Amino acid sequence: MKDKVIDGSRASARIREQLKERVACLRARNIRPGLAVLLVGEDPASQVYVRNKVAACEQVGIHSVTERYPSAWTENQLLDRIASLNGDPAINGILVQLPLPPHMSAHRVIEAISPLKDVDGFHISNAGLLMTGKPQFQPCTPYGVMKLLESEGVSLRGAEAVIVGASNIVGKPMAMLLLAAGATVTICNSKTRDLAGQARRADVLIVAAGRAGIVDGSMIKPGAVVIDVGINRGPDGRLCGDVDYGSAAKVAGAITPVPGGVGPMTIAMLLANTVEAAERSAI
């Protein structure tokens, strides 16, 4: 491993530079990767995430279209729009920003996206391909975590990897990617009886529970690699992760900060999936 603090901003910058070259090759063939981002409602955090994604697209030369719709929009209206984008050759990737308003089914909406344009990697077809070890698109956050571990020279073959959190977006696909890399994987959920004991077994500990401070330094094996996927607001309004950074950093061999760790990598891998989709469409 390299530095104790795993800098996701630095790693993502390297990936974006590589993507610029791939985009330039596509544009030399009169192909410009295109990403459509659909935002329903006025969720402030979603607004920020969408702006960050659009800005990242511009940096690497991806054409992006952002469509904002009111919360009163119906699910059928959104499904109709997705169907139209599925057939648009200028759009290689479709991203529906979550969460959606309560009257919409995220499952039905995600399943309406063509698996060939599902650059978030959430469609059931892409989840199945990931499960069988032949992914078409890897979900962006787990994909970014794997790239971070690779950039730090972390060997996963035979390693004990523990994931705190079992969501469809992070925990479950993260487990599949770690298994494919040769790790022995344990997933902890809200019913896990001895979370601290499980966490202390980890050579690589990935925390994605959505709860600030659920893991602290007393739960970490000395020298372990700690990846904090969480993003929360502390009592002071500042961003914080699921790991108590102060105590964890004293024990861990390497650790990601929040912000500046996994977040930039998630966006970088969204761009990578979009470029990959464009390259496939050009074959």
From Swiss-Prot:
Catalyses which reaction(s): (6R)-5,10-methylene-5,6,7,8-tetrahydrofolate + NADP(+) = (6R)-5,10-methenyltetrahydrofolate + NADPH; (6R)-5,10-methenyltetrahydrofolate + H2O = (6R)-10-formyltetrahydrofolate + H(+)
Any one GO CC term of the record: cytosol
InterPro entries: Aminoacid_DH-like_N_sf, NAD(P)-bd_dom_sf, THF_DH/CycHdrlase, THF_DH/CycHdrlase_cat_dom, THF_DH/CycHdrlase_CS, THF_DH/CycHdrlase_NAD-bd_dom
Coiled coil residues, start to end: none
Pathway info: One-carbon metabolism; tetrahydrofolate interconversion
Gene3D superfamilies: Leucine Dehydrogenase, chain A, domain 1, NAD(P)-binding Rossmann-like Domain
CDD domains membership: NAD_bind_m-THF_DH_Cyclohyd
Keyword DNA-binding on entry: no
Positions contributing to NADP(+) binding: 165-167, 190, 231
GO molecular function per UniProt: methenyltetrahydrofolate cyclohydrolase activity; methylenetetrahydrofolate dehydrogenase (NADP+) activity
UniProt entry keywords in alphabetical sequence: Amino-acid biosynthesis, Histidine biosynthesis, Hydrolase, Methionine biosynthesis, Multifunctional enzyme, NADP, One-carbon metabolism, Oxidoreductase, Purine biosynthesis
Function: Catalyzes the oxidation of 5,10-methylenetetrahydrofolate to 5,10-methenyltetrahydrofolate and then the hydrolysis of 5,10-methenyltetrahydrofolate to 10-formyltetrahydrofolate.
Assembly notes: Homodimer.
Family per similarity comment: Belongs to the tetrahydrofolate dehydrogenase/cyclohydrolase family.
Protein name per its UniProtKB record: Bifunctional protein FolD 2
